[in-house]
Amino acid sequence: MKRSDITFQKLLKILDLAISEGFLTNNAAKDGINHSKGYLFSKENSSFLKSFEKKDLAIDLGTGGGLPGLVLATFTDCFWLLTDRSERRCAFLKKAISDLDLNEKVEVVECSAEELSLGDYRGKAKLVTARSFASPAITAECAGPLLREGGLFIVSEPPFNNPTDNQDRWPIEGLVDLGLKQKEQWHTGLAGYRSFVCVAKCSEIYPRRFNKITKNPLF
């Protein structure tokens, strides 16, 4: 069996275990690998993907059962931080990383996303990803401060019949405060995605404490 096939089978087993642990639903795990790869492995991101170096930092917010961060870490060469505030989920992710032989290029950080943005990783990430993390405003405020200029923030989008419904979720004026600008929008046939580029350093007032973010979102 090819190494790539072995890795794929390991990922499937890990996602099955995530279901049994209550970290993923059956539907999320079913297409989890392909859905996760859709964040980066598309024609819209081909040049960005090719520019990745081993020293580059990517961060996945609220990795939970492994989507998309664990999958993307498996198929990319850069260094990944997988974040989650749950001790139990972090223990699961650490075991998964070991099973996939990713210890040298992946680290699990047990903390909230806004806490991470206030530390040493602020302004360091070339890529930040999030899936079903929170509302657009909350997710953007947690992601924006982590990005370096030129870095990308990529999210998966819920299904909508009308594309403008998704557009309204990410108002330009709200993103400007975080130094973000919409870059691309694409659909793989399985799911839709949206990327934002960091065009300016995020203001030092962000992120706010989580209770303030939720009570008074930017948009």
Feature map (PLM): residue ranges:
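Conserved SAM-binding strand-loop segment of SAM-dependent methyltransferases
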Residues: L102-E114
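A short acidic, Gly/Pro-enriched loop at the edge of an enzyme's catalytic core
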Residues: E114, L118-L127
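Conserved beta-strand signature within the Rossmann-like core of class I S-adenosyl-L-methionine
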Residues: G150-N161
